Curated annotation (Swiss-Prot):
Function of the molecule: Could be involved in insertion of integral membrane proteins into the membrane.
InterPro entries linked: Membr_insert_effic_factor_YidD (IPR002696)
Source lineage: Bacteria, Pseudomonadati, Thermodesulfobacteriota, Syntrophobacteria, Syntrophobacterales
Designated name of the protein: Putative membrane protein insertion efficiency factor
Taxonomy, superkingdom: Bacteria
């Protein structure tokens, strides 16, 4: 349930708020899409952690570029 709430908040941001700001993210996928995919793939806590780390890298002094959500390894199990 918490997961659905966070995913809904991210979608709201993407559909309503982000278009008002214009394209500013230096990464592909965008930071909001990265957080959405991370939460879908790893669950709420690890997804928020990965999304937060990404947001900390999204600044003018970072080159940006293609930075997908890491694939789960054999040791990583999704926590839902």
């Amino acid at each position: 349930m918490i997961r659905s709430i966070f995913l809904g908040l991210i979608r709201f941001y993407q559909i309503v708020l982000s278009p008002l700001k214009g394209p500013r993210c230096r990464f592909l996928p965008t930071c909001s899409q990265y957080a959405y995919e991370a939460i879908e793939r790893y669950g709420i806590w690890r997804g928020l952690f990965l999304g937060g780390k990404r947001l900390l890298r999204c600044h003018p002094f970072h080159a940006g570029g293609y930075d997908p959500v890491p694939r789960p390894s054999a040791n990583n199990h999704p926590s839902r």
